[in-house]
């Protein structure tokens, strides 16, 4: 049995992924927020739990394990840090202590590693931690403790190695450390998602950086290419799970024209932009908001622009619309992965008003073939052809905490405690289980080989 410590465990995404690897046991999990610890214990009752500010506790208090997983404070590294600090709360205030100290610092990783001499360490953070000024000093500190390392930049929608990925585009930084002299984990294998090449058909895609600087996000700094030499680096798009797979289609929301309070002006503009672009032709394709921080926001995309490996299925003429005030947020197909989930609920669901959808007895239907990798949940209705849908006749609602939980790829039975706001926050802070699963699997395989 390979044992693992999960520091800054939050709601338990990293632990949930780790225990999906055969032979791996999470021995202890720790976080400073009691509600997060309670949530973790609710779902992982066989794990030991410690509620503590990790920057203020002695590492010797914790048992030694084979692997350390750590997800230190990411707020000060994120490009979203520049956002206004006061954000209207959709439900109720977050506890002050959780607001001020969501996680401990990156320096707690070498502090714990110095005491416990873990066989391997995995550190998760936002992509921009690689631009943190003490980043190189932090790596040197781990090197001085006897570790070699490899840094992986991975999007959770590409974590296909041991199962389905997350239905969400979520770029993250992962630093993997192993003891000098131990076997190097095969991290390249887990970064080859399935794709479809126009020439060679199904392939295991290879990552290709656009420049010599290997730091960044999918599409912005790297893409995937066909591995066959004869293709001469033909770009391919990996398969993904659509956002439609996490939406409860039995709840269509309220007709916009019937809402007692109008939606915000920016939200209405985004809805109208999506309708004008995608619902003005013969087919009203489903759309979803792709809400990415920073200036390089992802463009709106129709489901008909999907990669050949993703066959449209289980789709709905719908929009997910961001409701927060920042510019540059655009609608995108629900056949695309869900946008990166933050700690706030900022995404709404818009569906066209179709009479047959008002009843509860409609059977599941799709517009084309079903997805090869997954089917959408709930009841579904095929798209219709016709003229542009009026904005007043469309239905709109916010995504529920349960839908956001599923967008993070937590199991359906996973229980996240607290208020709706607490649940959204814990989901947004979590590690997606598929990414943790694949990374822990690679590390565990290297340790078994060494043994």
Kindly label every feature range from the protein language model:
Residues 4-18, 63-85, 103-106, 121-126, ...:
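Conserved proline-anchored active-site loop of SAM-dependent methyltransferases
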Residues 56-65, 164-166:
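Short amphipathic alpha-helix with an adjacent loop that forms part of the alpha/beta core around
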Residues 100-183:
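Conserved Class I SAM-dependent methyltransferase catalytic core
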Residues 164-272:
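Flexible, glycine-/basic-rich loop-and-beta segments that form/coincide
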């Amino acid at each position: 049995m390979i044992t693992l410590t999960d520091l800054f465990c939050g709601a338990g995404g990293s632990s949930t992924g780790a225990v999906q690897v055969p032979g791996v046991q999470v021995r202890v999990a720790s976080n400073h927020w009691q509600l997060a610890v309670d949530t973790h214990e609710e779902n992982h009752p066989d794990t030991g739990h410690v509620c503590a500010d990790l920057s203020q506790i002695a590492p010797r208090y914790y048992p030694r394990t084979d692997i350390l997983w750590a997800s230190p404070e990411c707020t000060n590294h994120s490009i979203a840090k520049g956002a206004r600090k006061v954000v209207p709360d959709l439900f109720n205030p977050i506890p002050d202590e959780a607001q001020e100290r969501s996680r401990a610092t990156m320096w707690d990783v070498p502090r714990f590693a110095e005491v416990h001499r873990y066989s391997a360490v995995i550190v998760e953070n936002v992509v921009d931690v690689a631009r943190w000024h003490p980043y190189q000093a932090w790596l040197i500190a781990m090197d001085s403790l006897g570790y070699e390392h490899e840094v992986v930049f991975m999007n959770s929608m590409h974590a296909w190695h041991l199962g389905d990925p997350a239905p969400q585009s979520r770029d993250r930084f992962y630093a993997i450390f192993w003891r000098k002299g131990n076997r190097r984990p095969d991290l390249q294998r887990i970064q080859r998602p399935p794709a479809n090449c126009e020439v060679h058909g199904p392939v295991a895609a290879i990552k290709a950086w656009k420049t010599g600087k290997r730091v960044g996000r999918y599409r912005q700094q790297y893409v995937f290419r066909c591995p066959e030499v004869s293709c001469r680096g033909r770009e391919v798009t990996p398969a993904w799970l659509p956002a439609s797979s996490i939406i409860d289609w039995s709840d269509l929301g309220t007709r916009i024209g019937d809402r007692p309070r109008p939606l915000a002006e920016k939200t209405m503009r985004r809805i109208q932009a999506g309708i004008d672009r995608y619902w003005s032709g013969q087919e009203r394709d489903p759309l979803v908001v792709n809400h990415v921080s920073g200036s390089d926001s992802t463009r709106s995309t129709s489901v008909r622009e999907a990669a050949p490996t993703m066959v449209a299925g289980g789709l709905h003429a719908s929009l997910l619309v961001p409701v927060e005030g920042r510019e540059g947020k655009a609608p995108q197909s629900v056949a695309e992965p869900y946008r990166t989930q933050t700690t706030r609920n900022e995404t709404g669901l818009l569906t066209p008003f179709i009479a047959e959808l008002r009843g509860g007895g409609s059977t599941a239907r799709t517009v084309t073939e079903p997805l090869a990798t997954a089917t959408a949940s709930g009841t579904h209705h095929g798209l219709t052809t016709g003229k542009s849908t009026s904005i007043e006749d469309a239905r709109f609602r916010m995504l529920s905490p349960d839908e956001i939980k599923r967008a993070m790829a937590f199991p359906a039975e996973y229980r996240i405690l607290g208020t709706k706001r607490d649940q959204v926050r814990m989901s947004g802070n979590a590690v997606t289980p598929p990414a943790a699963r694949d990374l822990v699997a690679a590390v565990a395989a290297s340790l078994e080989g060494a043994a």
